[in-house]
A protein has these predicted regions:
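Mobile cap/lid helix-loop segments that border enzyme active or cofactor-binding sites
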Residues: 1-64, 92, 186-212
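Alpha-helical scaffold segments that form or flank carboxylate-/histidine-based iron centers
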Residues: 33-38, 64-79, 109, 145, ...
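Short alpha-helical scaffolding segments that buttress acidic/His motifs in well-ordered protein cores
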Residues: 39, 53, 69-74, 104, ...
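Iron-sulfur (Fe-S) cluster-binding segments and ferredoxin-like electron-carrier domains
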Residues: 46, 84-103
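N-terminal hydrophobic signal/anchor transmembrane helix of membrane proteins
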Residues: 69-86, 152-169, 192-202
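Acidic/His metal-coordination segments adjacent to aromatic residues that form catalytic metal sites
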Residues: 104-115
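C-terminal end-helix/capping segment
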Residues: 169-197
Length: 212
């Protein structure tokens, strides 16, 4: 990536509460500090995202691991490299394996997902790309796998990350540029600046291909 198109707000210019959130981002990830340091230009936007993300992505009634699969599906389909090279530590602890992130754009044919995960990913696909031809079958599948509270929460989480990632991919930001020295939530092969550079120069790098 080249030069950032919107600068990072220096940590020392933030108030104490915002600094605490930035340290949490560095310590826990998803999101990593760089995107939050851009949002810090508009504190109302910073907190609107941070509070909403905590409430509907990190917390709630729907399985967190499913929400993270959908988050990375969106990364792959809109090609947001900054977000797509992160993994939720909570989702990994819940049992998600790296191979399940690798096959997201082929989820319907993949053996790496169960029916509930595939239904959730079809929801993410529809939010990103539009309703499939058989609308009744689409909704029947979702209702067979999720309660209505889960569908609302999951839909809001997907919609939030879809909008944010569609914006973040334009910014030119990358990892290990702000509050460097931590690797929380970084995907394998991206945990240091050197690893990140090597992985992104590989012909097998996921973003080297086409989206969707």
């Amino acid at each position: 990536m080249g030069k950032n198109h919107i600068s990072y707000v220096p940590l020392e210019q933030m108030d104490e509460r915002m600094q605490e959130e930035m340290h949490r981002c560095a310590r826990e990830g998803t999101p990593r500090p760089e995107s939050s340091a851009v949002r810090a230009h508009a504190p109302n936007a910073f907190w609107a995202f941070a509070d909403s993300w905590k409430a509907i992505f990190h917390s709630g009634v729907c399985d967190h691991a499913i929400k993270d699969l959908c988050r990375v599906y969106i990364s792959r389909t809109v090609k947001c490299e900054f977000c797509g090279n992160q993994r939720s530590e909570k989702a990994i602890k819940a049992g998600l394996e790296e191979m399940q992130y690798d096959d997201l754009l082929n989820f319907e044919k993949s053996e790496h997902y169960d029916e509930r995960q595939k239904a959730a990913l079809s929801y993410a696909e529809a939010i990103a790309w539009g309703m499939p031809a058989d609308e009744d079958a689409f909704w029947a599948r979702l209702h067979a796998n999720f309660s209505e509270p889960e569908l609302v929460e999951l839909g809001c989480a997907i919609a939030l990350t879809f909008g944010q990632q569609s914006w973040i991919r334009l910014l030119g930001i990358d990892h290990h540029q702000y509050m460097a020295g931590t690797d929380a939530s970084m995907a394998p092969g991206f945990r240091t600046a050197e690893e990140l550079a090597a992985s992104k120069s590989s012909p097998d790098y996921w973003a080297a291909g086409s989206a969707r």
